[in-house]
Amino acid sequence: MSAEVTHTGQHPETGALTRRIMGVETEYGITCMDGEVRRLRPDEIAKYLFRPVVDKYSSSNIFIPNASRLYLDVGSHPEYATAECDSLTQLINAEKAGDVIVNRMAVEAEAALAREGIGGQVYLFKNNVDSIGNSYGCHENYLVRREVSLKALGRRLMPFLITRQLISGAGMIQHPNPMSKGEGFPLGYCISQRADHVWEGVSSATTRSRPIINTRDEPHADSHRYRRLHVIVGDANMAEPTIALKVGSTLLVLEMIEADFGLPDMELSNDIESIREIARDQTGRIPLKLKDGTTRSALEIQQVVFDHARRWLDHRVESRGTSNEEMARVLDLWGRMLSAIETQDFSQVDQEIDWVIKKKLLDRYQTRGNLGLDDPRLAQIDLTYHDIRPGRGLFSVLQNRGMITRWTTDEAINHAVDHAPETTRAHLRGRILKAADKLGAPVTVDWMRHKVNRPDPQLVELSDPFSPVDAEVDALIAYMEAHAETYRT
């Protein structure tokens, strides 16, 4: 292929976007414990968590200098939405930076509680289900072209997304919950935390029916050119390679659909029934009914998609987005994971895939203590795996001991804590926010609109999420600098 890709990463011959804007929204579970005693309600802890934010910005819904969004979501869940990223490793750094940022807030909240004579530690969990069965999300966002029908795209994507839990689930011990709307599944280990909490395939709702794909038309970009694919079904992941496989495989599938690369129609007869069954089948072999009357297993569906993706890499034209080298790493892990499921020998991925890592940990404790799967000590291990506090959460302990494979580095993650991605619109937002923070200028910011409120309102709208340069932003920052004295009075 000789034609060059555009600045958006779209190849003129295949139509595939190999440079794609994407982001992840993570809701965190929250509690405060003093020993085994719960000290405060989640809404009370959340107030302490966000008090410094509200004191500084007069709001609990803000954009921060690394261009990400930080806010308090429904149900008192702290939520962190990464800035716009255009490559896989950049996104992993941005997502992991969110863990660092909210953990720092938790440490500060503990200090504030102690000053008021309230003991206890604040716990933030990067998981998807609390102890009484309430679910909170980890949502992925992918930019697609406006001419793409999200419903049609969703139908093509659905078999992959429903079976993707096999390769990227977070894993959990599933306890029967009489309070849930579930189907009465028995005690067992599930490979996905989110599978039981979606109720539709494609829908414009997010909380009422929790679809696998949300179709609300909110592109946060030029609405004449782009749509935003909002994937709700994914688990929140701790291991960097699991995040890479979850997002990287999805990028490859989107590219193949856009390029019409010959993925066969494997539309499932019942999406919701299938996703529940797969979550409880670590072999991936339960036959699933397809709409064409045939059956395939989840493992077979993933293998078909993987085989096409491996061939696609030979045709994929590199852009400034995710490199072919990164995608080769994704395919290597994807292939090894499918082989592990096929052979039921998970030793080749037991330092990379969350649900496998956690199950190995639980199995070891269960065997050592001769424990039943419903033993509270195993439930504690299950939960503590997701505690984001370094040195306290089990995941971080394993990673510090070299028992978890890294995809990126602490240095890159810490850089992303304070710096916006440099290759997208996020860079411009970060520049504006840092200048405003330094000068004390009052600004109002969202994904597209950036406004300096005084002395005279100045508004810049950035509709191209791919562009990290803009003369109007330069002028806006110059305006703030010219009125620095105004902001000091």
Swiss-Prot record:
Enzyme kind, highest EC tier: ligase
MF-aspect GO terms: ATP binding; ligase activity, forming carbon-nitrogen bonds; magnesium ion binding; ubiquitin-like protein transferase activity
Protein name, as recorded: Pup--protein ligase
Active site residues of this protein: 73
The organism of origin for this protein: Corynebacterium efficiens (strain DSM 44549 / YS-314 / AJ 12310 / JCM 11189 / NBRC 100395)
Keyword ATP-binding: yes
Residues engaged in binding ATP: 69, 82, 447
EC number: 6.3.1.19
